[in-house]
């Protein structure tokens, strides 16, 4: 059995869950999330707790036991408090802005890059160089933040580009040059 999978998931009072077949639905103040669990994973929902169990001795179910518990825990956290990912833009003339819910990036290309966020994802821009991605689904928030970063990842010489807040970029020394 998985050490993580054995842990009980606590349900806050403002969260309601339903489990039908292999599908779990979590409702909360921020929204609703739906996920299909793999075969061999069962849930036992009691007053205020969820216990994730494997049915039978399936090797695949044992492998996905801890993952399923963590995904359910993330769903509960998402609909109650939400998730956020912060990005920083570094570079002379690099900036961002919001226009009709679309993120517009000016990051050194000959054109501006426009990103339309998916459903249930909100993007905020503070002082043109700080981007915050907000949402209830941790996986989608991470994917959107990753796609924004991939537009101009930090380069290793001066560190210009888009990076996660707190990310440390290892810089290289430039060319040694010719001795004169």
Curated annotation (Swiss-Prot):
Gene Ontology terms: cellular component: chloroplast; cytosolic large ribosomal subunit
Molecular function GO terms recorded: rRNA binding; structural constituent of ribosome
Keywords annotated in UniProt: Chloroplast, Plastid, Ribonucleoprotein, Ribosomal protein, RNA-binding, rRNA-binding
Residues spanning the signal sequence: none
GO biological process, one term: cytoplasmic translation
Subcellular location: Plastid, Chloroplast
Assembly and binders: Part of the 50S ribosomal subunit.
Function: Binds 23S rRNA.
Family in the record: Belongs to the universal ribosomal protein uL6 family.
Name listed for the protein in its UniProt record: Large ribosomal subunit protein uL6c
Source organism: Porphyra purpurea (Red seaweed)
Lineage: Eukaryota, Rhodophyta, Bangiophyceae, Bangiales, Bangiaceae
